[in-house]
Amino acid sequence: MKIKYLFYIGVATLALSGCNDGFLERAPEAINDKTFWNTTGDLETYANQFYSYLPGGVTSIADGESDNQVPNSIPQFFWNQLSTPAEAASWCNWSKGGWQPIRLVNYFLTHYQTVSGKESEINQYVAEVRFFKAMQYAGLMRTFGDIPWLDKDLGTGDTDILYGPKLKRYEVMDKIIEEFDFAIQWLPEKPATGRIGKDVARQLKARTCLHEGTYYKYHTELGWADKADRLLKMAADETDAIMATGKYEIYNTGHPEKDYYDVFVMEDKTNLKEAILPVTYLDGKRKHGMSRTLAEANTGFSKDFVESYLCLNGKPITGNDQYKGDTNMKDETTDRDPRLKQTILTWDFPTRVTVATNDSTYIEKEEDFISQYCLTGYKSIKYFIPTDKAFEANNNTYDGIAYRYAETLLINAEAKAELGTITQADLNKTINVLRDRAGMPHLTLEVGFTDPNWPAWGYSLTPLLQEIRRERRIELAGEG
C-alpha cells in the first residue's frame, strides 16, 4: 500500500499545521515566542515548512540551461542575453524567495534553545533545519559565487550586516560543509516516513562537494586548485558511506529494454531501493501533472545529446558499423544504448493510449516529431505515461524521486577518477551497475577508444573522465 509522503508546508508566522497536539490546542492569539518554543513537537512543526523546498522529483525537462536540452524559447542565459544589473533586486533568485528560507532558518536557530527534551531529539530537528540552510546556500553560491553568510536573525536595524562584506566562494563552501556535517551527525539513519535522514544529507553534501571541487580544479584563474582535492575526497567519502549501508540498489529486473523507463513511471516508489528519498503523491492528497506537461509541446533534447549515446557494442557512433545514421528516428535509435529509446519519444512508443478501448496512437510521419511535440524532434518520455487519464491536468499520482541512488554511484566514480584513485573494482560497483541495467558493455579503466566528439570542455580530460561524464549525462538526462 502506498504510504503518504508529507511535504510539510507552513509559514513563518508560526500559524503552522502539524501533528503537535499541544500546538493545535493553543488559541491563535497565544502563539508567540514565549508560548511556542517549548517541546520537540514545536521544533518538528516549525521544521515542516522547509520540506516544500525539496525537489518534487518528477521532472525530465530540467536541463534547459545546458547542452542537453533546448527549450521552446531561448533562455536568457544563452546568446549573451544575460546582463548583470547595477542592483540585484529579484535578478536570478536574489530576492525574497532566495533569502527568505535563510531568514526562517536563522529565526529557528535563535529561538530553539528554550525547548526541553533529549539532546538527540532536539538536535534531530536542528539538523533538519541546518540541512535546508546548506541546501539553500549551495544554490545561491552556485549562482552568485561570493555572497554574505548570515547566521543570526536580523532586524531592520542590522544594516551593517545586511549590507556587509561578502565571503569568498570557498569560505561560503566551508560554512555549508559545517551545516551538512551537523545534519549528518544528528539526523537518523532510518528516518520516519517522509522525513530526511543521514543519507539525504550525505547525498547533497557529496553533490555539492563534487561540483565545487571540479569548479576549483578547472577554473584555474581563481587560484583555488589546491582546495579541490579536499572537496573531491569528501564527495567520495560521503557516497562510500551511502553505498556501505547496503540499503540501496539499482532497479534491475533483467529487462534492459524497459527497466530504466519503469523506474520513473512506477506508481508506488515507497519501497524502491533506488530512491534515497521518494516523493509520494496520492489521489485526494497531492498530485502532479507531469504527463500532461510532457504531452504538450515542450523542451526537447538536443541533437548533440542524442548523439552522445553509445551503440550497443559500447562504442560511440563515429566510425561505428552499428550506427545506422539519422535519416529517420528508427535508424537513429536502432542498436543504441537502450536508455535512448526509454528517454525520447520514438516511432514505436504510443503518444496516447485510450484505456477503455485499448487504442493507441503513434507518430506516423517523421516531421510530426518536430511539428507536434518539440522543436528539436527529441521529446522526453521520462516520467511520461501516455494513458488518457494521465493526460488530465494535475491528475498524476505516480511517485517521484527527490534523490536517486544512481547519482550516488556517479558521484562516487567521478570524484575518485578526479582524485586519480579509482580502480576497476570502483567502476564495477558504480558505472557498470548502471550499465548492467541497460544491458551495455562494462566501462574499463583503459576505455579502449577515443571519441572525436567528446565535448571540448576548455581543459583536458582523461578518456575515463570523459566516459564517466557521458554516463552521468545519459543516466540523469533531464533531471536537472
Where are these regions (language model features)?
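Bacterial Sec-dependent N-terminal signal peptides
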Residues: 3, 15-41, 176, 206, ...
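Membrane-proximal, proline-rich intrinsically disordered regions
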Residues: 19-62, 317, 325, 330
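Conserved, well-structured interaction surfaces
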Residues: 39-56, 74-144, 160-174, 178-193, ...
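Short coil/turn linking the two alpha-helices of tandem helical-hairpin repeats
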Residues: 141-143, 148, 191, 211-220, ...
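Short coil/linker segments at helix-helix boundaries
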Residues: 146-169, 216-234
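Polar, glycine-rich mid-to-C-terminal structural blocks
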Residues: 207, 211-213, 234-329
